Amino acid sequence: MAEHIELKRVVMVKAIVTEAFKENLIKELDRAVKNIEMQASQMDMQSKNYLEDLKKKGLMQKAAAFKHQLDDERTRQAAAKSDLMMKIEEAKRLEIGTEFVQGPLEGPVKVGIGDNLYKKVGGAEIIVKDGIVQEIRGAE
């Protein structure tokens, strides 16, 4: 019978907000907005030619279905861009010294007989400041 087993657990990464962190976060979000805009522009150019080609061939139903798909994709891209713009505004309002949740990572944890499973697998956090680990919380 095994005495230990290694499991995966979620470790939350939080960043201490600094000016450099805010600048990098805003640049990253802005880059994502520009990427969406570029994709939308390319999609518009390519789809215009494709739609004209379908209409020339008399494939009106196919053109209508494609236009519907195109409209759905434009709506999705507009929503994604709007979401990113809101995140940029939120990033600008972040206060220096506060903690910002960057997201989860998976990490291994060794669990043995007699361990409290809930303490071992739950609630671990890594606190970073400008990419440097400052603190590890809840790692039993």
Predicted regions, residues:
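Amphipathic alpha-helical coiled-coil segments
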Residues: 22, 29-36, 40-43, 70, ...
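Short, charge-rich amphipathic alpha-helices with coiled-coil/heptad character
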Residues: 1-26
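Hydrophobic alpha-helical segments used as single-pass signal-anchor/transmembrane membrane anchors
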Residues: 127-128
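Short clusters of small/polar residues that mark proteolytic maturation junctions
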Residues: 137-138
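Long, charge-rich amphipathic alpha-helical coiled-coil "stalk/tentacle" segments
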Residues: 52, 56-86
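Extended alpha-helical coiled-coil "stalk/arm" regions
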Residues: 36-62
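Coiled-coil termination/hinge junctions
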Residues: 74-124
